[in-house]
């Protein structure tokens, strides 16, 4: 039963075919099964129950929460040894909003440490494996959430997206990953990584469920001054597939196979299928055009992201000292205790990011690196803002193919000719744009994804376009096969 969508589960609850306890118990059982095979969780809440009486469509529905959201009375580690025993005394606003609807949190999902990674291999609990092929990654940082939704543990899970941390894992795991407009959902209680980029979002197995969940998560919050009043936006109520006349663009340089030296067969197939999807969109009544963007601007995207995100992370995580929370470090004085705590607690990947962040924020380097990165970010955002005046959205393939093998993962910063194709989703974080990934097919029996990004506050348009394409392709509600074999 639990592998159904939200509407179907609500109907079963409403007509008395099942109880909330039935769904929760089944979800917990599936979670343990998945944990034994794919290592998707930090905590499974075996005594989870519904204490709320609500007429919400989400009442009684189990869900998962990425472990960088604060959850009252439940371990919240950020998948880091620095917070391995941290139990918050409050809920993140997004979690609180779902609890008010009567939804039941049954698990905290594993992630790349503090959300700083794109592989799902740096959690303090170990590598999170892809439910479609346990030799492959889920992507990151929201690996556990993507994995568990794909495996059918529950119909939705929370993620967070700073560069592509919802949308890339969604593609690799064959589910929907939705990052709303920046500020639609409160970040209060979300462990800060890069505050100008961080966005709360959701994984589901269809676009409709994504609309339902974000309707419940969103809202203005006096504890997060970046939130805005979205009360007049009813994503689920206004969801439709009427896309005739909509205009989309894609970045020509990134989807032209001739621009890649020695392209793999997988990349060739991925781009070939993307161009077929463009024809599908045109046959649906949409106008889709290629747009050329200055290569210098495109090539700058990964570097700008690294510079800004590392700088903000270095500042945000300066409070992780081992003195206020987390395991106490050893030392004869405060400085030695802090040094011991941070040296032992953070992984090498996190330390590298802090080194970069500290370097670009040094007084003598700020102008050359950090401030210039902020200026280039503005140029990129302005370019896309101008395009969104003419077009309803940008349509692009996600990444360069299927999920990589765990054995081939390299957690260092790389530079190759697919680098921008792998990282173009970061544009949505630069501008706070709404962006959604949906399953678009399979290559070698592994899922790949399609992304739609639109202008700020145009979430309804983005969801409607994704919904229409989803209805046409019919890759929704797919459960990952063979994860327990």
Regions found by a protein language model. Give the residues of each.
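Short, well-ordered alpha-helical
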Residues: 1-87, 91-92, 114-116, 228-241, ...
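Conserved hydrophobic/aromatic pocket- or pore-lining residues that grip, position, or stack substrates
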Residues: 27, 66, 98, 126, ...
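Short glycine/serine-rich loop/turn segments
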Residues: 58-200, 251-253, 311, 396-414
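Short, surface-exposed loop/helix-turn segments at secondary-structure junctions
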Residues: 81, 227, 305, 332, ...
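Structural helix-boundary/capping segments
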Residues: 33, 100, 151-156, 162-258, ...
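Short alpha-helical scaffolding segments that buttress acidic/His motifs in well-ordered protein cores
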Residues: 23-27, 301-305, 350-358
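General small-molecule cofactor/ligand-binding pocket signal
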Residues: 106, 287-294, 436
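Conserved acidic residues
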Residues: 39, 155, 392-394
């Amino acid at each position: 039963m639990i592998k159904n969508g939200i509407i179907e589960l609500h109907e079963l609850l409403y007509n008395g075919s099942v109880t909330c306890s039935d769904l929760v118990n089944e979800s917990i059982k599936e979670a343990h099964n998945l944990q034994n095979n794919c290592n998707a969780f930090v905590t499974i809440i075996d005594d989870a129950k519904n204490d709320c009486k609500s007429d919400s469509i989400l009442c009684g529905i189990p869900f998962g929460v990425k472990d960088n959201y604060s959850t009252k009375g439940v371990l919240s580690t950020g998948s880091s040894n620095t917070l391995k025993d941290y139990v918050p005394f409050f809920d993140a606003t997004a979690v609180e909003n779902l609890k008010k609807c009567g939804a039941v949190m049954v698990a905290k999902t594993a992630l790349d440490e503090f959300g700083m990674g794109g592989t799902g291999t740096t959690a303090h609990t170990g590598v999170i494996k892809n439910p479609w092929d346990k030799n492959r990654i889920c992507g990151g940082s929201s690996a556990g959430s993507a994995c568990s939704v794909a495996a059918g543990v529950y119909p939705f899970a929370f993620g967070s997206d700073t560069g592509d941390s919802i949308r890339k894992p969604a593609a690799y795991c064959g589910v929907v990953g939705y990052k709303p407009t920046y500020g639609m959902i409160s970040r209060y209680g979300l462990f800060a990584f890069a505050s100008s980029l961080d966005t709360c979002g959701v994984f589901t197995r269809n676009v409709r469920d994504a609309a339902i969940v974000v309707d419940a998560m969103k809202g203005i919050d006096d504890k997060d001054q970046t939130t805005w009043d979205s009360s007049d936006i009813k994503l689920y109520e206004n969801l439709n597939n009427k896309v005739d006349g909509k205009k989309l663009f894609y970045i020509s340089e990134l989807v032209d196979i001739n621009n890649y030296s020695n392209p793999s067969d997988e990349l060739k197939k991925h781009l070939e299928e993307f161009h077929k999807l463009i024809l599908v969109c045109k046959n649906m009544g949409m106008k889709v055009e290629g747009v050329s963007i200055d290569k210098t601007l495109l090539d700058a995207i990964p570097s700008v992201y690294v510079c800004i995100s590392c700088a903000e992370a270095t500042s945000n995580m300066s409070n992780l000292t081992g003195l206020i929370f987390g395991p106490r470090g050893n030392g004869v004085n405060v400085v030695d205790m802090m040094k011991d705590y941070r040296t032992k607690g953070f992984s090498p990947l996190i330390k590298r990011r802090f080194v970069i962040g500290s370097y670009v924020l040094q007084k003598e380097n700020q102008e050359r690196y950090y401030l210039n990165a902020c200026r280039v970010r503005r140029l990129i955002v302005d370019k896309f803002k101008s395009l969104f005046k003419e077009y309803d959205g940008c349509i692009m393939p996600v990444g360069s193919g299927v999920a990589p093998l765990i054995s081939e993962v390299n957690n260092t910063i790389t530079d190759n000719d697919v680098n921008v194709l792998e990282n173009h989703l970061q544009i949505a974080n630069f501008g706070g744009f709404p962006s959604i990934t949906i399953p678009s097919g399979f290559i070698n029996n592994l899922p790949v994804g399609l992304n739609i990004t639109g202008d700020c506050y145009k979430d309804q348009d983005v969801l409607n376009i994704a919904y229409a394409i989803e209805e046409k392709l019919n890759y929704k509600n797919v459960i990952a096969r063979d994860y327990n074999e």
